[in-house]
Amino acid sequence: MFDHPYLAMYQRLHEEFGLKVQLNLFYRMEDFDLSQVSEAYYDEWEANSDWLKLSFHSKLENVKPYESSDYDEVYEDCKRVHEQIKRFASSAALANTTTIHYCSLTEDGLKAMEDNRVFGLLGLFGSNQNPRTSYGIEESNAEKIRNGEI
């Protein structure tokens, strides 16, 4: 598995500096989906799961996929990716945090993530000069996040 240049780089950085990596996965891209991923590297994924994690990102790479999605859509898309990760890489390789594509979810989508045992959402909050907010967080709280207050 570490013959792949990106994974080899991550492994080298882990060995040299203790780097920990989380890869956020789309379920489908053009003519490929996660159900086609081989189980041949299962043992390697599991053996490296202390520093190399996989997580749900989105069903497809499209513009703001969950900005107005209901509970069922988000729940099923996340569940499908989680099932595939467990199949080809082990439960140990499944992260309990993620970054949703475009950092946007409805309240129902947030509940769907929690029900899929995702307990941390990583977002984009920008800087004080170029502020951003994620997951519908109020700007006042986003500012506190940027300043390290929460």
Where are these regions (language model features)?
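Generic structural signal for hydrophobic
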Residues: 13-14, 45, 113
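N-terminal regions that are enriched for targeting/export leaders
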Residues: 1-15, 19
